[in-house]
Every structure is written in structure tokens, then in C-alpha cells.
């Protein structure tokens, strides 16, 4: 578990979403990349192997302060893809919740949604609306994963066990945007909570 623990620490300190695992090649004596480990794979491993750990997981999201709830960047379906790109760069984010005029969450626009708009080196589609860009998603696109502030962390891990989740959108009973929980938020909480029990610190 120590290497996995160190991988989590390095991800948090560098804000990396994935890091390569290096091993020494016996034949060449050189370091070689064995695989690339992602935040999702780490959390999936924890979710599968700590199913019965109830001490830290049976706490509501609101009680542990998990996620971001202020200065949230949002967009409308009628906004252009280019405006979303500028917003992502400005706020250093990879996802923007799409809301209606009442603040109800309709969808999310992700960095990967930009790729079809610049395919072939043609950038005209960047002037199209976010709604148009989302229509280019494959039919099996997973859509939004959401939770409420009262959902417990173990229910989030249950979702991670079953689905490939990159983030959760926190909404109220009317599906209005409250916050966003990223995978790094969850990893940070798991590390801090575990280190507090051991009397250690991340810094």
C-alpha cells in the first residue's frame, strides 16, 4: 500500500490526474514505464477493497466539507464552445456544469467534448454552441453523476465501484447546482482522514 499512498500524495501535490509507474528493466538496467495509474483507478481499488470500512465512509458530504461550493464556473447551452474553453483555461478546470436560467443542472461540458470540435485541424466548430457540441457525444456517453449534500461517502464509493466516474455534481432536491466533487477531493479526504488517525500530516 505504501507505493499507492505515495502515488496519491504525488498526484495531490502536482495536481496530476495520472502518473506513470516506473520499474527497472532487468535486461537493459533502465527504468521503464509499466503502466499509467489514474485517480479513478486508485479510488476504484479503494472502493473494491474497503467495502466494509465503515468508520470513515459513513459520513455525509456536507459534514466532511467534501468538494467545491463557491466561485463555481457555469455555462448555458447557448454559450459557445470557445467561451467554455476560455473559462476552463481561466479557472484551470476540466469540466463546466451547464445550467438553465434557474440554476438547474442540465449537463456538464468536459475538456474531452472539445476534441470533436477541432478534429482535422478545423476550428470553426469552436463558434458553435455548447448544446451543439454535446450532441456529438457517443450514444453510450455516461452523462451526469450527481449526489446530494446528505449522501454519505460510502454511497459515492458504491458509485465508483459500479461506474467510471470523473466527478460528481452536488445538487439540491430541485436539481439546482450546489457544488462539485472531484476525484482529487475524495483522494485528499481519504489521505487526510487516514493521516489524522495516525497522527501524521500531508505537509
Write out the residue ranges for each language-model feature.
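Short, structured patches in soluble enzyme cores that scaffold and shape functional sites
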Residues: 23, 38-41, 77-79, 100
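Proteins with a high burden of low-complexity, intrinsically disordered sequence enriched in S/T/G/P/A and R
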Residues: 1-3, 117
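Preference for long, well-ordered alpha-helical segments
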Residues: 32-33, 38
Amino acid at each position: 500500500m505504501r507505493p499507492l499512498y505515495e502515488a496519491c500524495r504525488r498526484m495531490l501535490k502536482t495536481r496530476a490526474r495520472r502518473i506513470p509507474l516506473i520499474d527497472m528493466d532487468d535486461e537493459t538496467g533502465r527504468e521503464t514505464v509499466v503502466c499509467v495509474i489514474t485517480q479513478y483507478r486508485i479510488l476504484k481499488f479503494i472502493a473494491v477493497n474497503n467495502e466494509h470500512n465503515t468508520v470513515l465512509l459513513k459520513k455525509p458530504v456536507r459534514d466532511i466539507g467534501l468538494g467545491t461550493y463557491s466561485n463555481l464556473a457555469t455555462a448555458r447551452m447557448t454559450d459557445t464552445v470557445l467561451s467554455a474553453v476560455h473559462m476552463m483555461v481561466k479557472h484551470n478546470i476540466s469540466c463546466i456544469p451547464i445550467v438553465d436560467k434557474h440554476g438547474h443542472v442540465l449537463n456538464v461540458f468536459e475538456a474531452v467534448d472539445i476534441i470533436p470540435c477541432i478534429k482535422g485541424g478545423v476550428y470553426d466548430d469552436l463558434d458553435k454552441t455548447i448544446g451543439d457540441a454535446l450532441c456529438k457525444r457517443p450514444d453510450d456517453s455516461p452523462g451526469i453523476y450527481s449526489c446530494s449534500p446528505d449522501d454519505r461517502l460510502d454511497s459515492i464509493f458504491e458509485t465508483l465501484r459500479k461506474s467510471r466516474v470523473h466527478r460528481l455534481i452536488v445538487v439540491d432536491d430541485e436539481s439546482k447546482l450546489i457544488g462539485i466533487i472531484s476525484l482529487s477531493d475524495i483522494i485528499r479526504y481519504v489521505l487526510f482522514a487516514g493521516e489524522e488517525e495516525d497522527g501524521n500530516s500531508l505537509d
